């Protein structure tokens, strides 16, 4: 099975949760990216340490400090746009922790060509994989929904009547 091309998250505060997320990764990831939406320099140092922290499953760590909070959808779009050639993007809340095997299962589901979105649990958007063809067909997340909330439901409304195949829940769990 191939590695996850991109696993990204956005954060405004509480960087200790990102570290928990980081060390719960137990499956190969090519690019782990963090968009720091804090904009005040309060958590820059703690996040920069991720770039030098050893991790056997992560090939590249990218931390980008934004000058202001661009919002949830803005950060999600940056994850996608920063790795435009990826076949899919795993986007996760920063305070999620994966159980062993969760990312392997997500990668297996995302490898199915017909699947458009893989949700972690019950169709939720706290951790999901979005395929490249979904972005080509339905666009990016609406940044007018600022700073957060409803960007996920707005995106889902775009394809709900097209009967896009989705994986709504994985067998393996995660904590959030």
Residue ranges, per PLM feature:
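Conserved nucleotide-sugar donor-binding
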Residues: 125-139
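Short, well-formed alpha-helical segments that are part of the catalytic scaffolds
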Residues: 13-27
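Short alpha-helix within the catalytic core of nucleotide-sugar-dependent glycosyltransferases
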Residues: 22, 77, 86, 100-111, ...
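Conserved donor NDP-sugar-binding/catalytic core segment of glycosyltransferases
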Residues: 96-127
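Donor nucleotide-sugar recognition loop
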Residues: 139-161, 165-175
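Short beta-strand-to-loop acidic/aromatic patch adjacent to the donor-nucleotide binding site
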Residues: 86-97
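Glycine-rich, basic loop-to-helix element that forms the pyrophosphate-binding segment
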Residues: 66-83
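Acidic donor-binding segment of Leloir-type glycosyltransferases
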Residues: 26-64
